[in-house]
Amino acid sequence: ALKIYPGRALINSISLETEKMEKLLPLAAKYGAMFILLPLSDAGLPKDVEEKKQIINTIYDKALSLGMAHEDIVVDGLVATIGANPKAAIECYETIAYCKDEKKLPTICGLSNISFGLPERMYVNTAFLTMAICKGLTMAIANPSQELLMNAAFASDMLLDRPDSDIAYIERMSRLAEEKAQYETVVVKKSDNDASASNGTCAAGSKDAVFQAVLKGNKGSIIDEVKKMLSDGAKPDEIINN
């Protein structure tokens, strides 16, 4: 796959597990790919942050010895579920801060892991994301359609004075406001139409019946419905055009 990939690949992921280290790391170096450094070993999950740092350093040093560059490496914060490990978030924050402040490496993490098994997971994920960004998180694996999560990310970047983050936040909020206004306009129009129908407006009911008859190809009822509209005062061109 690396031979034919049209661009620079990002391998997800390479850990200290023997099979991955021996096979994938040399391939990444050979084909100039970036890779996500996953701080796991043959022993499984690291028992604490210090062991996680040791794994990161071991893989990092091995990558450089194969000719890879510092810029080729992105570290996975390795998020565990807080339901199983109450210190999961804190340990991830410490890992992110270590990579940012001491190793000068970018970081990534899967947000949803932190809240697995908990109710109303979106609030946990959002709080976790904002705190991780503050610690230096570079990238996150998340659902971009989740509005609360994305808004928090844009706001966090702005509060940390990241380049052009204020413009990005304002533009996003403006777009969301426009979308909300359009939605409310549609709802109001629908409510008005419903109110008109509930007040016994026969023309509206007949108009809808004609539309449904045309839509469904119901030839048997369309003539009677058109006649009803005409008797209610509708003009022929209005029936055709509307």
What are these regions (language model features)?
Residues 2-71, 81-108, 112-242:
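ATP-dependent carboxylate/acyl-activation modules
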Residues 78:
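Short, well-ordered beta-to-alpha junction loops that form the rim of enzyme active sites
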